[in-house]
Amino acid sequence: MINKEFDQDLRYHGYRLMAVDGSQIHVPTNPNDQDSFVNWRENERPHNEFHLNAMYDILQKNYTDAIVQKYRTQNEDKALIEMIERSPVSDALVICDRGYESYNNMAHLQTSGWKYIIRVKEPGGRGIADGLQLPECEEFDFPVDLSITRRKNKETIERLKNSNQCRYIPNKVKFDYLSKEYKRGDPTELFTLNFRIVRIKISEGSYEMMVTNLPKEDFQKEELKELYSMRWGIETSFLNLKYIVGMLGFHSRKSDSVMQEIYANLIMHNMTQFISNCVQLHAKENKYDYTIRFSVAATIVKSLFLGDISPLNAEILIRRNVSPVRPNRSYSRKPRAKAQIQFTYRIA
């Protein structure tokens, strides 16, 4: 309801840009909750863990949907499909990382009318690319019309000889659009996926491979590279959610209460972003474009909700705290020492 009220319907070439990803959440230890209890994992002590699956509007910078699962029952593919099916958006472009590489996910996206960009494993990684005959060059943009079947009979055996034309998948592989049981003489079921598999150079000696159903005439390789890089917004939002909004500082151990706190923090993140989006930044001729500093905005929005400052003062303060946008920067991740967070300094 809140999302609908603040929806600006921002689009890229007519598409709503959505990123889907998951993130682990360490919650207060509760050995009685066996579904979330991690008894042992290398270099880790026993703890409880939830998994947040989120759909994120890249242009508006807010979460449009979320599904929270427990450690032992987590299933990112199932969560993705559920979020697609209940989304009111009919013309979206969803961008996913390699964790969502599967024919079943591609089929659900194609059937829903959504476009997608999904990063896939390189040949040899036991992924989609392994079963295809791809060009022997460093970069390529290769169209594929692939029929999926669970049957091996006279009708399919000849087609299966061409791995770019037909693919057999056994019953143990999940694919919701083909029956697992059939009788002799039943017509052969086929489901055709239409996509491009693209390999792009991202830096010296580094390449990314992805599948997409975007039309080639409208979206060339370089544009796909730029679009995929925009997926990083959801990674940044997870950091904001955990360490600025304060999602990791739980008050309760009970699963239902922990779940409630997670959704409360998602709402707080969205409200901070919605209010920030309403603040108009003054146009200046500077070297960089500027964006509102989320860390400061979250504190200001909290004070606004508590009645400590007026809406006008909140707008002025948010407008004053901006950061330059410096694109194409990357740094290696360096682990740092971590201290506890005092309750006084948490946002929520």
Kindly label every feature range from the protein language model.
Residues 1, 8-16, 20-33, 41-348:
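Single, function-defining residue in the core of a domain
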